[in-house]
Amino acid sequence: MLRGTMTAWRGMRPEVTLACLLLATAGCFADLNEVPQVTVQPASTVQKPGGTVILGCVVEPPRMNVTWRLNGKELNGSDDALGVLITHGTLVITALNNHTVGRYQCVARMPAGAVASVPATVTLANLQDFKLDVQHVIEVDEGNTAVIACHLPESHPKAQVRYSVKQEWLEASRGNYLIMPSGNLQIVNASQEDEGMYKCAAYNPVTQEVKTSGSSDRLRVRRSTAEAARIIYPPEAQTIIVTKGQSLILECVASGIPPPRVTWAKDGSSVTGYNKTRFLLSNLLIDTTSEEDSGTYRCMADNGVGQPGAAVILYNVQVFEPPEVTMELSQLVIPWGQSAKLTCEVRGNPPPSVLWLRNAVPLISSQRLRLSRRALRVLSMGPEDEGVYQCMAENEVGSAHAVVQLRTSRPSITPRLWQDAELATGTPPVSPSKLGNPEQMLRGQPALPRPPTSVGPASPQCPGEKGQGAPAEAPIILSSPRTSKTDSYELVWRPRHEGSGRAPILYYVVKHRKVTNSSDDWTISGIPANQHRLTLTRLDPGSLYEVEMAAYNCAGEGQTAMVTFRTGRRPKPEIMASKEQQIQRDDPGASPQSSSQPDHGRLSPPEAPDRPTISTASETSVYVTWIPRGNGGFPIQSFRVEYKKLKKVGDWILATSAIPPSRLSVEITGLEKGTSYKFRVRALNMLGESEPSAPSRPYVVSGYSGRVYERPVAGPYITFTDAVNETTIMLKWMYIPASNNNTPIHGFYIYYRPTDSDNDSDYKKDMVEGDKYWHSISHLQPETSYDIKMQCFNEGGESEFSNVMICETKARKSSGQPGRLPPPTLAPPQPPLPETIERPVGTGAMVARSSDLPYLIVGVVLGSIVLIIVTFIPFCLWRAWSKQKHTTDLGFPRSALPPSCPYTMVPLGGLPGHQASGQPYLSGISGRACANGIHMNRGCPSAAVGYPGMKPQQHCPGELQQQSDTSSLLRQTHLGNGYDPQSHQITRGPKSSPDEGSFLYTLPDDSTHQLLQPHHDCCQRQEQPAAVGQSGVRRAPDSPVLEAVWDPPFHSGPPCCLGLVPVEEVDSPDSCQVSGGDWCPQHPVGAYVGQEPGMQLSPGPLVRVSFETPPLTI
């Protein structure tokens, strides 16, 4: 029987063996297709010293091997010395002590990779002592609610409060005694019976310790008359933080006579009728809090006494949410040599820190790994990059994670895929990464020659296994890093050392993207091996792009060549118009095309180069590549590269200098492994060096020992904020490294948003390097209040937020409103000239700004006033001097006249003179008068004088009678027909005397001298008066009139003509020669003629000339 059984077994052996192999193979494929998961996470625990702690971890699939970590270190199974036991995914701490507290993680491993759980924190329970305090006396109005506060000591977990009331310990609310979650005791409707001593105690539910306060509070209940409402608790505004899902009680206790009524409002709206809120007396209770419960709550008390709304207190409630993490895919397959991008959506409040892990090992940024809070990018994927990737998020209230499995495929399928794509579409080959990332695009030109579709495995130049052939060398890029085109770029290259025993190039892969702060997706193009040119299109103007390209042969991806370039800027229409107008204004004959010529009048150092890009050269060296900008009018002579270590505070260090301008890339050697660096570049010409370029992105030198820096916990502290102007706020802060166990930081994040915004997405972020402790936030809105907070960060993540500061920008300055002129009302403005209308005025023209208009007007007015004063002062001085001189001239000093008998012309303005029957006469200023001639003996004519306002006198036969228009000032009679001694009076000057032998004729102020041309028409003989030296002067009684009396001689001579009318004094007898019957050429009327030898005056009657002395004016 046994033999038959054995025979049957032997006959079935091949079938059983095959079945076992199939099952094993199926299990292997199942392992490859399954993504490891931790379905039950270990929970954080608080235990007393010496207590037992049990941590559980459930994984899927369950056959995975589970290990544990303590504070990031692997626990090699059970450790008796440490007191830790590990059995079937469960960790047991037999006796908790200071060595076994910390963060625990379970790690599940399988051939496809490893996954780690979220950290579980194990801490020791403790209860501290009460702080020393003094006794407080609490007074409350009868019928109101009293509050006894208890300041609980520090406890972990939170201690429970107990009160000693009337020699009895109260552990829960009872009667009119309410024990609140905050630890306060509220005594409702207090009365005289509630007076007494109250004491509180703290109870730790884990250690079961009880500690009592060292001081007591005394309650007094008083009886008062009417009293306004007041809030006795809380004494000031409060900020409450609650975790999502928990209940919240906001306390508000008011006092007053009569007892006040308490109302609640949230963000300005009443909470009455809100489903989630209830009232516990005057306190507000919120069940199962959520994010929408965050906001500002207002408690207001009013009893009708005093000013309404005076008793108000505010609560600022923040609901914290544990993180939620989601990832789009659970599995991803990427061909070798291509890039993979993993996105991670993280939610939570406060914003969680994000940690990326591969096979349960934390990742740090490097040239191939680009990490951010929302995405992980892996460049040039290879077999070593396969595994399970985790996005783990953590904040103050919890942690969460998501998992994706990343697999790679061999590049040998690439030619086949390329051939299939080309045969189907007739376009250049699609990059293999297009299969892994559908968003990536293929850009190229159609109908390109097809490269070889396959390479036989027997070919000596293309071995079948990867690694047996040498990878292709990096192509040589020939294109310039700058282009004038705004939306395209011509990429040109050539292979390096093609042939030389290497496998032939099958195709090229070109990747390009815009260089921004957040990594964008690469645009990938596959190019045939015989094509060495590619036009990149649909680019943004004035933007910086980076290009990576590599050649592929049967050995896979070759070495990578990199270049960065900048597209041309698109000129703005208004800028072009202003430039053309400026050129036409400066040189009307110049054409707009001349604007393209450089302006050598503006010479300066070069502009700062663009931000450099960093690529790996070796384990301890990198390539720094940059693009120059403007040269400042002189050619760039050299470049210099500087670097800075991010984990150390210090200045920038010169890496290399004297780099020729033909080189736009340099290798920096001697870098420390595991150290993060930033690089920047300067350009130099003969006028100096440029400003430094923007620092490069952090670069971590590979070969690090694997140490992971923990994220900083404590953030910075903002110490100062100030509004610099209407769009800029400056802030300063302090950071204490000791608060984070001297954990190195890379820099700070500054968040700001308008204060009136409640949306966290409105926050904008600025990044500042770690060695700076001040920053200016620009491009803000005028007269707007902003909330400002900060974080510090390093490779491990971001710290907690700092304190929040509120600062308001300054108001925008008015554009000349106070000094604006009113619109014209009398006359409209003059229309501009045709030239002004037709000629365009550029923006660079000298136009007064509206804000300068008031100052311009004030300056013009003041300048005009000063000019008028300066002009008027000399005129007044001249006028005064002229009057004074005129008065002195009329005084007739004898010694002042020269012997040539000069005279001053005094035109007697007024009506013009007339002639009648050939007889001339003179006209006065306000009337007409016939001139009187004065005839001396021997026929010497003296002259004629006309006085204003005189009636006409008939001097010659047939002369017309003239009618005066005004009353006469001087009345004069014809001396030949009869003489009136009272009709002529001469006014003497105030300082003259008869002894001086001179008289002063006072003429009107507006009188002038008039020159009468001599006429040959003779008049009849006239009898003219002449002043006599021996004359008397007397004052008429009761009259300010001086009378000068003299004997006028008469002479009968030949006909005479009217001569000149001077008003002067004859200095000597030489001025009038009378011998031989000659005429005196000039002679003043009314002048004093002394009785000098050779002169005889005919006797005649006494003549009186009367003048009224006018007031002296200056």
Curated annotation (Swiss-Prot):
Q: What is this protein called?
A: Brother of CDO
Listed PANTHER family? BROTHER OF CDO, PROTEIN SIDEKICK
Which segments constitute the Ig-like C2-type domain? 36-123, 129-213, 235-315, 323-409
Q: Where are the membrane-spanning stretches?
A: 856-876
Q: Which residues lie on this side of the membrane: Extracellular?
A: 31-855
Cite the record's note on assembly: Part of a complex that contains BOC, CDON, NEO1, cadherins and CTNNB1. Interacts with NTN3. Interacts with SHH, DHH and IHH. Interacts with CDH2 and CTNNB1. Interacts with CDH15 only during the early stages of myoblast differentiation.
- One cellular component GO annotation, for this chain's record? axonal growth cone
User: Mutating V713M: what's the consequence?
Assistant: In a breast cancer sample; somatic mutation
Designated gene of the protein: BOC
Q: Which organism is it from?
A: Homo sapiens
One GO biological process term:
cell-cell adhesion
